[in-house]
Curated annotation (Swiss-Prot):
Belongs to the UPF0114 family. Keywords: Cell membrane, Membrane, Transmembrane, Transmembrane helix. The chain crosses the membrane at residues 15-35, 53-73, 136-156. It is a multi-pass membrane protein. It is found in: Cell membrane. It comes from the Bacteria. It comes from Salmonella dublin (strain CT_02021853). This is UPF0114 protein YqhA. InterPro entries: UPF0114, UPF0114_bac. The keyword DNA-binding does not apply. One of its GO terms (cellular component) is plasma membrane.
Length: 164
């Protein structure tokens, strides 16, 4: 009975495979939105004010960071929790594949969230005159919470690695 339960639990990791595939569909949706924004801004680029163009560019950078985060979670999560990626020797392979454990992934995700939050906060500050002060305050508090959380996770990871 124990062996059966262990085999079922081990096989259940494959339930995550469609979830990771779903992230690739989310990446496609993000890419479509990215190019929709580019196609929307290009015809009007000369009529846009510099601040408006910068806001659009920050939005594109934001989407790019989210896309990178999706790729990192998709591949690392699949390799850590489902199965190794079988990429033939002749094909290009990302140098971090197979090297990122769950803790490294967690730290990279935290750093990515801080970067995404920073871009979002910069966008908000560029339009600060149209944002109520209490809302600005909450944006800063939330961002600082992300920064502090990432710092604490990295610090705790360093402590646990040092003690082992």
């Amino acid at each position: 009975m124990e062996r059966f339960l262990e085999n079922v639990m081990y096989a259940s990791r494959w339930l995550l495979a469609p979830v990771y595939f779903g992230l690739s569909l989310a990446l496609i949706a993000l890419a479509l939105k990215f190019f929709q924004d580019i196609l929307h801004v290009l015809p009007n680029v000369f009529a846009l004010a510099e601040a408006d163009l910068i806001l659009v560019l920050l939005s594109l950078v934001d989407m790019t960071l989210v896309g990178g985060l999706l790729v990192m979670v998709m591949f690392s999560g699949y390799e850590n929790f489902v199965s190794q990626l079988d990429i033939s020797a002749g094909k290009e392979k990302l140098n971090w594949l197979g090297k990122m454990d769950a803790t490294s992934l967690k730290n990279k995700v935290a750093a990515s969230i801080v970067a995404i939050s920073s871009i979002h906060l910069l966008r908000v500050f560029m339009d600060a005159k149209n944002v109520p002060d209490n809302k600005l305050m909450w944006y800063v508090i939330i961002h600082l919470t992300f920064v502090l959380s990432a710092f604490v996770m990295g610090y705790l990871d360093r402590l646990t690695r040092h003690n082992h």
